[in-house]
UniProtKB/Swiss-Prot annotation:
Coiled-coil spans in chain: none
Provenance organism: Bradyrhizobium diazoefficiens (strain JCM 10833 / BCRC 13528 / IAM 13628 / NBRC 14792 / USDA 110)
Assembly and binders: Homodimer.
Xref: InterPro entries: YbaB-like_sf (IPR036894), YbaB/EbfC (IPR004401)
Origin superkingdom: Bacteria
Entry keywords, A to Z: Cytoplasm, DNA-binding
Localization per record: Cytoplasm, Nucleoid
GO cellular component, one term: bacterial nucleoid
Origin organism lineage: Bacteria, Pseudomonadati, Pseudomonadota, Alphaproteobacteria, Hyphomicrobiales
Major localization class: cytoplasm
Any Pfam family: YbaB_DNA_bd
MF GO annotations: DNA binding
Name of this protein: Nucleoid-associated protein bll8115
Amino acid sequence: MADFLGMMKQAAQLQSKMQEMQDALGNVEVEGISGGGLVVVRMTAKMDVKGVKIDPSLMKAEEREVLEDLLVTALGDARRKAEAAVQEKMQSLTGGLGLPPGLFGQ
């Protein structure tokens, strides 16, 4: 019975910490970069895009396809970095709770 109560207490702690982490992820920002910095996308770890910077040299009509490709690449780079930030936060959150490895994608 004591084990069950301990597990319930851990579950409540985890739920509280998960909510704190979700709130904190909105403040974690990453940058996705492509074309050696010609395109930079800023987003939060919650995947909200906060800004896009485009080098003026890409603003020509003949560079449209290059710009489109660089935007896709920069967004993908930012998404990967945001996912890594989430993983890092999740590992720090669940590390001391004695949960089985891989339970939350660790």
